[in-house]
Regions:
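Detector for methionine-enriched segments
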Residues: 1, 16-17, 25, 48, ...
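Short, functional C-terminal segments
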Residues: 1-25, 99-112
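Generic hydrophobic segment detector
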Residues: 7, 59-63, 77-84
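Charge-rich, solvent-exposed alpha-helical interaction surfaces
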Residues: 9-20, 38-42, 67, 71, ...
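Amphipathic alpha-helical interaction modules
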Residues: 20-74
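Amphipathic alpha-helical binding modules
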Residues: 72-112
C-alpha cells in the first residue's frame, strides 16, 4: 500500500530539489534566505497542485496549466527569477518517487 503524502512530504521534496538543482535554474544568481523559503513554499504548492493534493494560487495554477503568459503576469519578483525551476518541478518531479531521498538528504553541507 502506497503511503499517503503529507504537506511536509511535498515541502521536503521541494526543498531538496531547490538545494540540488535550484541555484543553476535561478535567473540573476543568488537568492536571500527569505526568497529561498518563498521558492520552496511555492515549489511545494506546484507539486501539490499537480498531484491534486490541494489547489494553488493563480501563479501556481498558471505553471501547472502550462500557461506561460499567465505565469509571467502573476509572478512576483522572486518567481520571475524562478520560472525555470517551477516548470522543472512541474514537468520532472514525482514526490512519491523522490520522497525517500528527500527524507535522507544531507542539507548541512549545502546550507553552510
Amino acid at each position: 500500500m502506497e503511503k499517503k503524502l503529507t504537506h511536509e512530504d511535498y515541502h521536503d521534496v521541494a526543498r531538496m530539489m531547490y538545494f540540488k538543482y535550484g541555484n543553476s535554474m535561478i535567473l540573476g544568481g543568488h537568492l536571500n534566505s527569505q526568497e529561498v523559503n518563498h521558492v520552496i513554499q511555492v515549489g511545494a504548492s506546484v507539486l501539490m497542485t499537480k498531484d491534486g493534493f490541494q489547489q494553488g494560487g493563480s501563479f501556481v495554477q498558471a505553471v501547472v496549466n502550462n500557461d506561460l503568459l499567465g505565469a509571467v503576469n502573476r509572478a512576483d519578483s522572486t518567481m520571475r527569477k524562478c520560472l525555470l525551476f517551477m516548470t522543472y518541478l512541474m514537468a520532472h518531479v514525482s514526490v512519491s518517487y523522490e520522497l525517500e531521498e528527500a527524507k535522507n538528504f544531507q542539507f548541512e553541507n549545502i546550507e553552510g
